[in-house]
């Protein structure tokens, strides 16, 4: 199976971060998460997931103002320099990759060294939706 690493930046995502990690680890080999100053328990949730055995690396960038593009590029370069992988996927904490028919093997056929587009669903909490039914 191809090795995929995801890169995610978070700030105060306690309502979704555990579900995001558990779902994403269905296809990711490792998750790199950049904590941009969480104060709602998100980091503690991630640390408990690491204790459970999830392959997560957390970096801290607690900047009040930041340009996401620059931070993402910083960590893309860092990952490229320190990790062995087949694919690197920047994904937001509210984005759940969702291949057609739930066929995760689609990742095996993606070409390397170029950009690919993968379907995803976005999680938004409101009175009508919950994480259990976003894939309906």
Report the location of each language-model feature.
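Short beta-strand/loop segment that forms part of the nucleotide-sugar
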Residues: 29-37, 59-61
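Gly/Ala-rich phosphate-binding loop of Rossmann-like dinucleotide-binding domains
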Residues: 25
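Active-site acidic Asp-centered loop
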Residues: 36, 91-93, 119
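Residues at the starts of beta-strands that form the adenosine-phosphate
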Residues: 3, 29-31, 55
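Catalytic-site signature of metal-activated, phosphate-bearing donor transferases
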Residues: 69-76, 99-136
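Active-site beta-to-alpha loop of glycosyltransferases that engages the nucleotide-sugar donor
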Residues: 2-22, 37
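Active-site-proximal specificity loops/subdomain of glycosyltransferases
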Residues: 41-90
């Amino acid at each position: 199976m191809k090795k995929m690493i995801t890169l995610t930046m978070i700030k105060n995502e306690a309502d979704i971060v555990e579900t995001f990690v558990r779902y994403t680890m269905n296809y990711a080999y490792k998750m790199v998460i950049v904590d941009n100053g969480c104060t709602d328990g998100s980091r503690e949730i991630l640390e408990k997931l690491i204790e459970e055995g999830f392959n997560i690396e957390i970096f801290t960038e607690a900047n009040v103002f930041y340009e996401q593009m620059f931070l993402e590029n910083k960590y893309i370069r860092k990952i490229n320099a320190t990790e062995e992988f087949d694919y690197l996927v920047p994904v937001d904490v509210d984005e759940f990759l969702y291949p057609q028919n739930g066929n995760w093997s689609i990742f095996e056929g993606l070409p390397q060294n170029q950009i690919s587009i993968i379907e995803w669903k976005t999680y938004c909490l409101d009175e009508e939706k919950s994480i259990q039914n976003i894939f309906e």
